[in-house]
Structure formats: structure tokens, C-alpha cells
Regions:
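Extracellular Ig-like/FN3 beta-sandwich strand-entry sites
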Residues: 45-47, 164-168
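Extracellular structured ligand-interaction cores
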Residues: 3-5, 112-114, 129, 168
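Aromatic-rich carbohydrate-binding modules that target alpha-glucans
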Residues: 13-30, 116-163, 170
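Solvent-exposed loop and beta-edge segments used for protein-protein assembly and interaction
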Residues: 42, 109-111, 152, 163
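Intrinsically disordered, low-complexity regions enriched in small/polar residues
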Residues: 37, 49-50, 88-90, 98, ...
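Short, well-ordered helical secondary-structure segments
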Residues: 37, 102-104, 134
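Basic K/R-rich, polyanion-interacting modules in nucleoproteins and related proteins
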Residues: 75-126
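Long, internal scaffold/assembly segments composed of regular secondary structure
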Residues: 2-84
Length: 170
């Protein structure tokens, strides 16, 4: 006797999953799952991304760089618009890749940079918290990646250290 449990993940994120699915049909040596709506996730736009493979130069997603105790990378601000239409832009489903052009073994030689995230809004989201997340933090909503609202600029902000590489985030 064998037991099979099916889990459908949204973008390899274990926090967004569908479980307890039962086969809709049984064939010889096959279990068929022919759901339509039950296995769909609510769509959203693609992940944002940035690349810090070279700390001293701006690259994808980086608006400004400052050299302090570590390099500070200020990402282009994202603009919140709940009416924004879906736009196809290939991403890596919230994942990240440690990489650098400044060393041979990125896993042990890549440096860290202070990443500055910002989300422009017209007003704070009433009763809601805003986070930066992706595979780099196991898609977890933690105090470290929670954004705080800057009422002077109507912008949510968060800053934390990340190792050099290519990142998807939301």
C-alpha cells in the first residue's frame, strides 16, 4: 500500500499552497488531477527584481549607490496602484541567485550590501502591514523585512543586508 499526498505550491512558496487534493480519476498506474478552479492561485503581477553582482556600479533595479561602512543600494521606488493591469515580465518566481563579478566563488566571497526598498502610496494601508519578501527570507513576514510608513513622503520603506546577487522580491 502506498500513500500519496499532493501539494500545489505558488511559485515554490510553501506559505502559499493547496493541499488535501484527491484524484478526480484513477487509471492503471495513474492518478489524474483535473481540477480547474480548485488548484488556481489568485494572480498578481510579476516579482520585482534587482542585481548587485557588481557593488560599485548601478545595474538592474538600482537607482543610487552610496559607499559607507558597506555599500548602500537604493532601489528604484515601486508605485502602488491597485488598478494596475497585469504585465508579463519574466521572473524567477521569487527566487534569488548569489553571484558576483568580483570573485571566483560567489557562495563564500560575495559581499553584503544594505538594500533600501521603497513603495510609494497615496496613504498608508489602514490596518495592514507591508513586507518585502521572497525566497531570500523563505517568504516569511518578519520584523526584519517589515516596511514602515514615511508620512512625509507617503512611502513605505525597509532596509536590510543582502548578499550580492540577483533577487526577485515582492
Amino acid at each position: 500500500r502506498q500513500e500519496i499526498k499532493v501539494v500545489v505550491l505558488k511559485n515554490e512558496n510553501w506559505n502559499e499552497k493547496i493541499t488535501n487534493l484527491q484524484p478526480t480519476f484513477f487509471k492503471a498506474n495513474q492518478l489524474l488531477y483535473t481540477y480547474t478552479n480548485k488548484t488556481n492561485f489568485w494572480g498578481d503581477n510579476e516579482y520585482y527584481n534587482f542585481d548587485t553582482k557588481f557593488l560599485r556600479n548601478r545595474s538592474l533595479g538600482i537607482q543610487q549607490i552610496e559607499k559607507k561602512e558597506v555599500y548602500h543600494h537604493y532601489l528604484y521606488p515601486e508605485n502602488y496602484n491597485k488598478y494596475k493591469k497585469y504585465t508579463y515580465f519574466p521572473d524567477i518566481n521569487g527566487q534569488f541567485v548569489i553571484r558576483t563579478l568580483e570573485a571566483n566563488d560567489a557562495e563564500i566571497e560575495a559581499d553584503y550590501a544594505m538594500m533600501h526598498f521603497s513603495l510609494n502610496t497615496y496613504q498608508p494601508f489602514s490596518g495592514k502591514e507591508v513586507y518585502v519578501y521572497g525566497a531570500f527570507n523563505n517568504f516569511e513576514l518578519t520584523p526584519e523585512n517589515k516596511m514602515s510608513f514615511d508620512s512625509e513622503n507617503n512611502t513605505y520603506r525597509a532596509s536590510f543586508l543582502l548578499k550580492q546577487g540577483f533577487y526577485n522580491y515582492s
